[in-house]
């Protein structure tokens, strides 16, 4: 079994925030792969799906971002899931909008959800880094991630979540490089390879 974790904050107030793109991604995967109904478990919402040929537990921690690791650790212990089989979808300030990178281990880049998971579970889990861009000034970061995606951003967010769901079987099978490439090609095909189109002024 693999564990797919989406990071975000619970409740309607945060649902459309940039910080919640991990929840959005996991919801898209659950819909596409006809996952079981969400239920309250492991200090969050949990579901199960067969993605490709793999049985996958889907988890959205409801502990708030800073305590996400408690939910992940509980689910990991219950099912005896190896850390190498844990995949975390999260927002990434250091990537341009609509860019996706997959990596194992590494630093937390100031992300409190990752920091909590690392503290509770260890560092060698997989990250699916979902680019949301940077506001350009460190002082603006808190407000930026806790604000909703702008109306003009929603098309790329929807296309990104669709692409993640379309190719989730590759990720479940451990084909991380192939998964990342397929996402890139899918978004390129929709025109999102031009960062200026999605408002990224850093590139």
From Swiss-Prot:
InterPro entries: Pept_tRNA_hydro, Pept_tRNA_hydro_CS, Pept_tRNA_hydro_sf. The active site is at residue 19. The record marks 9 as: Discriminates between blocked and unblocked aminoacyl-tRNA. It holds the Pfam family Pept_tRNA_hydro. Belongs to the PTH family. The record marks 91 as: Stabilizes the basic form of H active site to accept a proton. The keyword Transferase does not apply. NCBIfam families: pth (TIGR00447). Monomer. This is Peptidyl-tRNA hydrolase. TRNA binds at residues 14, 64, 66, 112. Its EC number is 3.1.1.29. Gene3D superfamilies: Peptidyl-tRNA hydrolase. It comes from Methylobacterium sp. (strain 4-46). It comes from the Bacteria. It is found in: Cytoplasm. HAMAP family: Pept_tRNA_hydro_bact. One of its GO terms (cellular component) is cytoplasm. It is an enzyme of class 3 (hydrolase). GO terms for biological process: protein quality control for misfolded or incompletely synthesized proteins; rescue of stalled ribosome. It catalyses: an N-acyl-L-alpha-aminoacyl-tRNA + H2O = an N-acyl-L-amino acid + a tRNA + H(+). One of its GO terms (molecular function) is tRNA binding. Its main location: cytoplasm. Hydrolyzes ribosome-free peptidyl-tRNAs (with 1 or more amino acids incorporated), which drop off the ribosome during protein synthesis, or as a result of ribosome stalling. Keywords: Cytoplasm, Hydrolase, RNA-binding, tRNA-binding.
């Amino acid at each position: 079994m693999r564990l797919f974790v989406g990071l975000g904050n619970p409740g309607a107030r945060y649902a459309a925030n940039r910080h919640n793109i991990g929840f959005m991604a996991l919801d898209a995967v659950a819909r596409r792969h006809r996952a079981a109904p969400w239920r309250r478990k492991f200090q969050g919402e949990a579901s199960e799906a067969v993605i490709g040929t793999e049985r996958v537990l889907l988890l959205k921690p409801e502990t708030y971002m800073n305590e996400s690791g408690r939910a992940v650790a509980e689910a990991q212990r219950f099912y005896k899931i190896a850390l190498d089989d844990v995949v975390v979808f999260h927002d990434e300030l250091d990537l341009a909008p609509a860019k996706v990178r997959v990596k194992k281990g590494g630093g937390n880049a100031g992300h409190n959800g990752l920091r909590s998971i690392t503290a509770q579970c260890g560092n060698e889990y997989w990250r699916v880094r979902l680019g949301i861009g940077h506001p350009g000034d460190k002082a603006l970061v808190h407000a930026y991630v806790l604000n909703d995606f702008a109306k003009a951003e929603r098309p790329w967010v929807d296309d990104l979540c669709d692409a993640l769901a379309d190719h989730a079987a590759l990720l479940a099978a451990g084909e991380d490089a192939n998964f990342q490439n397929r996402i890139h090609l899918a978004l390129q095909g929709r025109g999102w390879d031009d960062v200026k189109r999605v408002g990224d002024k850093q590139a």
